[in-house]
Amino acid sequence: MANRVPHGKAPIGAGRGKMDFKVLNRLMKQVFSDYPVHLTIVLICIVLSALIGVAPAAYIETITRYIEEGLTSGWAAILPKLTKALFTMAALYLVSLILTTIYTQLMAHVTQGFLHKTRVRMFSTMQRLPISYFDQTPRGDIMSRFTNDTDSLRQVVSQSLPNLLSCGLTVLGVLCMMVYYSLPLMLVVILGIVCMTLATKNIGGKSAKYFVRQQNSLGKAEGFIEEMMNGQKVVKVFCHEEAAKQDFDRLNDQLFRDAREANRFANIFMPIMGNIGNLLYVLTAFAGGLLITSNGLIPNLSIQNLVTLGTIAAPLSISAVASYLGMCKQFTANVSQVSQQMNAVAMAVAGAGRIFDLLDQKPESDEGTVTLTRCREENGTIVPCAERTGKWAWQHQKDDGTMEYRLLQGDVRFFDVDFGYVPDKTVLHNVSLYAKPGQKLAFVGATGAGKTTITNLINRFYDIADGKIRYDGININHIKKADLRHSLGIVLQDVNLFTGTVMENIRSGKL
């Protein structure tokens, strides 16, 4: 069974329940570096689509004014203008639809390509990690990074980030339009912005915090399940069923609590934001009605008046109020959309943090210079060769540039070796032994005595804390790990078959 992370210690990559903006920034940079051309086109389409999406609000004011004029002075002169305005607004919506279709299709390609590259990077990194990493990290937790965490990236890259940018630009454009039409009504909108900000900070912030915790709890639970599945026979042999169930219940309960809190806050968040938007709509309509019915007692201050009439104060028209109410709806809808996407972003940041944690792990170091080569003997001298001779030699380059060769014989010696899987707990003390070429040696002892540990040290799966291990008189730290392991034959206690033919499993790595 794999070694589990001790109770009370967070696994590698665990977050603290807060969204890390450094991780988000790194994620965005990584996506852009992988697909700079695609994302440049996407950004252009989003900006144009957002700006065009704001324009119809202005046309609503124009169309409403034309209808008012048609009702009072007749339709003969107004109908051509009204028709032109309607067709222009329809054309704007059509262009916005085309731009949206283009960038969503591009983002689908970018998302799947980015996930593909991320999985490749993770797997390549995993192949270069030392054995100690897999001892400290449950395999199920690593698998969760390949599945759940990458899936959270899919949603945020394909939907959340484009929506955040689009909605953010739309909100900015709508606010500018609101300032243009009426400064007094803008004060009502500012009140709504304050309420929405408080709701986002208090409710949305808590939801995001628990979504991050949910992602980490899910990784822990899956790691434990995978460990129990692989070690079920050991659990049965040692009658560990009840203890395993208690451990699982603890992890499952924690996952339940985190998921419950995350979804509880997320589920009440959108209704609250929606009702704040509805209340803002009513207050805006009420304030607009007061400005219209005040007969100039309450002046409407606007940039529009300054541009069209030369004065900043003028009565508010019904058409302006109608346009303003449409912008109000558009504003609240986009603010709610931005707030809703933050939960998905929080989950993705938690997943991205765990993925980057894996990618940032220090690969297994190898400072060896001695390599293994095929050889033959000529007049008592070892000579390297390319053909198969059944003989191998250690090849070492001296300081003067000449090559020294030493025949591979299999002489292994330990000199006062100390070792511990963790620095503060030594499991081998002053071990000295030798195995001469051709000699058969057996390590006999109870489980945990260190038999497998000694073979792991010979292969340099772990580095010793003190002492020396020499192989044919060469310090194994000076031998390249690939060549060292190539010279050794290992038969594992547990049989592990990879997907493929029997021959491929026998050859394993020499295909």
Spans of model-derived segments:
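Internal alpha-helical transmembrane segments of multi-pass membrane proteins, especially GPCRs
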Residues: 40, 44, 83, 87, ...
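Juxtamembrane helix-loop junctions of ABC transporter transmembrane domains
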Residues: 13-17, 44, 52-68, 92-139, ...
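Transmembrane helix-loop-helix hairpins at lipid-water interfaces of multipass membrane proteins
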Residues: 39-99, 179-184, 286, 293-318
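ABC-type nucleotide-binding domain
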Residues: 75, 375-511
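Helix-loop-helix
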Residues: 70-71, 177-191, 265-353, 358-359, ...
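Membrane-integrated ABC transporters
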Residues: 1-53, 68-88, 103-107, 111, ...
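An intracellular "coupling" helix at the cytosolic face of ABC transporter transmembrane type-1 domains
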Residues: 33-36, 131-132, 148-157, 161, ...
